[in-house]
Amino acid sequence: RAAKLELRDLSAPLQVYSDPFESRVEFARVSFGKNHLSHRSGRSDAFEWPTLARVGDEAARLAGLRVGNEGNTGMSSPKRYLWSREPTKQPWRLNYHGLGGDNEPFAAQGPFAVLVNDLGEPLHRLADDDPEKLPAMDPRYSRSSLFMFALVEIFLHAIGMVNSPGHRLQQPNSENPRRLDRIIMTIPSALSLAERRILNTRAHDARDLAYRLLRMIGEAELPPVADGALDDAGLARLPTAEGGIALPQILFEWDEASATQAVYMYSQIARNFAGHAGAFFDVMRRADNTTPKSLRVATLDIGGGTTDLVVINYHYDGAGANTTIFPEQLFREGFSLAGDDVVLHVIQEHVLGPIEKAAEAAGVPSGSAMIAELFGGNRSGQGVAWEVRRQQFAVQIAQPIAIRMLARYETSEESGDRTAQTFGFTELFAEGKAPSPTIVGWVNEEVARRGGTSFDLAQVKFPVDFEHLERTVRSVLQPMLEVLSEIIWRYRTDVVLVSGRPSRLPAIHECLREALPMYNGRIVPLHHFHVGHWYPFRDFQARIDDPKTTAAVGAMVSVLAEGGIEGFNLRGDRMRHLKSTARYIGKLDGSGRIPAEDTYYADLDLDDESKNLPDSAFDFRGVMALGFRQFPNPWWPATRLYTLDYVTDQERARLNPMTPISVRLARKQRGQDRLSEDLVIEEARTSPESGLKQAKGSLALKLQTLRDSEGYWLDTGILKQS
């Protein structure tokens, strides 16, 4: 009786969305009519929606209505910024377009703003004597807290949906109220342990805030759990409010790539092989895999922000249809290179290129210089309005055109039509998704200001050459896919599952077929995989319509399969405590790798809570990025984790003449005889020539997993790098 989550568009309440939605967040006020009528009833909040942040399609629609002169009203994906806990430079404001007004107040209104402070931190998690324990008035919510805001909104929609008359009438015992018992969340496979802990805390705080906003539980009934002290299995003690309402348990047990495998395994074993795991294993196991009762499956999950590879070995106990399957994760790795990077390169080569040529044809002396000035990095004299318009160009014009081009490329293989085509500007936007005339006019004005005459962005033609698009996709992803294919082959996997929305691109299938010495039948693209009628997000032929849905459905299957599904018993307890992949820590170079000479700590085992880092130091000469990799090979791509920098500009000016500063890191103390995987500065001293002065308090080691601290290109609009 699975049902897809429905999100109601609160600024257009008759519209309900049930398809997978993007993770954009937009601050907006909600009004359901004349509030003074509910005030007269004695229930002033009868028609009040308590939150500030809209999500999904509604957030995307509201963001598209912006004209380019507003303040900060939202962002593309707060999960990218879990590490960013500093206040924003500008306060957040409410997007006023949903209600048709022109007022843009601070995003510090309503019941939700009373429960968080200016940083977005829940007040019930702060000590009573904490000076920050004040309701939000100057909303400079950290980008990390916006992930919690989004979860609160999603949880409220879920609670409202399961108790709605329309949903309950379709279920048995429709007169009984519903409650959430468990909230199952998947984790990006490559997420660092530090970010995983932040994600866990944000999810629990979101749950608590949602139930406080609904007045189902008070602050006194919330568990006194400090930030970061939650374990992966959820809270052991669930508080119960008056009336017996218990908070749902939040489960963090499965990463996205592993959950995807659960969909495949359940579909094959329970549905296609009638519960006979042994028969399925025998059919799919390679001839050179001599281990009995085992099957080795890899998942290559290509998402929007990361590409993850997970290799799991399954073995079963029992016989016939009475078996238990035991998964064991052998390998996991992730790279911050995925679908959004493909979109960015398509924008650079296929969207900005025609605009540049059209501007030169209109009389602009150098179209490339104009593009670099408009969509390059921030420069002095550009103001906030310029940055907002640039960001709106990326969201309203560049990204939709690139995605539409890629969608045409996706279907070109199935249709067999690879003929180059040319599309007009308006043809590349879906119905009702046309960009704001203000943003189009801004581009036209900038072209005219540089000498262009009779230029109109709406008249620009965009050629779509599928061969050129394929080369663009390959240039971004092929080197990474070849590296991951080497890992897949070395682990002698029997089956490779390819998931994620970008996995539908034909170039990805071609790259894998070229790099993997395997029969095509062992490479299974989950797009259009015949999964059966049990799958909630199936198409009319019972196939997986969107492969990015497999993570959510797989997590549900994984939890239910622990004794709750007939014919399919999966023991997931061995998957709950994933090990750290940080084996080598050092300084990242410009290509995202850690050279051998910049590897400061090697052969680490951060899962052993009794072992600290080696007692060795490295030189600090200026702001530097620290990351990790799990292999000794210097060419292996590394993952960014920390930024080491001066605390203030004053300290930078004072200490820079005394560099190099010798820095020694250590693991953060978690408790008696227990060490965290988090790193801290243990010691920092200036050069011998300057007297070995203590500089520990002048440096800061901050979690930062994005290269650009200012933000992702979808949030900054920076489309061209010099």
Regions flagged by a language model, labelled:
Residues 182-198, 493-512:
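Glycine-rich phosphate-binding loops at beta-strand->alpha-helix junctions
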Residues 82-87, 91-124, 135-139, 242-247, ...:
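Gly/charged contiguous loops adjacent to phosphate- or pyrophosphate-bearing nucleotide/cofactor binding elements
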Residues 72-79, 85-297, 694, 701, ...:
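Nucleotide/phosphate-binding catalytic cleft detector across ATP-hydrolyzing
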